[in-house]
Amino acid sequence: MKAKVFIALLVVVLTLPALAHRYFFGLTEISSNLNTGAVEFVHQYTLHDVQHALSKLAGERFSLDKENAEAVLKRWVTDNFSVKNVDGKKVELTWVGFEADYQKIWVYQELPAQKNLCGWEVSNTLLFDTFSAQVNTINIVDEYGNRSLILTDENRTDIINCQKESKD
């Protein structure tokens, strides 16, 4: 009987790590700042996933405590997140900064005020090179309502649609 209990406990203990983190999800919100009119991009990711990706990229352990951490993070985000205007021209986002707690990291970018983002193309490949199951959701909040783009390794870009839904 003791052997059966021991084996059952052993199985539970050995499967816990596999259950700990089985999904890979990132969230970006695009919205206008009501005070400045600037278009704000707020990216939220699991800190451990970002550290893992940047460690893999650099070939050494990445930590936000390192002197060059913000520069490395900025380069990685800039290389993997982009927007193109309706004319297909890549638009440079201004780096605002980042903050993190023990679980999450938030990265902030912005654009000067825009008439709208209708027809703009958004590309987000953050963490795709590290986790094949990564899903990046982009929420757009503006005068056209709230909507989302779902990006995966197979679908890395999408277009911001601004058609208001009719309530007929």
Descriptions of predicted regions:
Residues M1-V5:
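Positively charged n-region of N-terminal signal peptides that target proteins for export
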Residues H21-D168:
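N-terminal soluble domains immediately following signal/targeting peptides that reside
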Residues I7-P17:
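Bacterial N-terminal signal peptides
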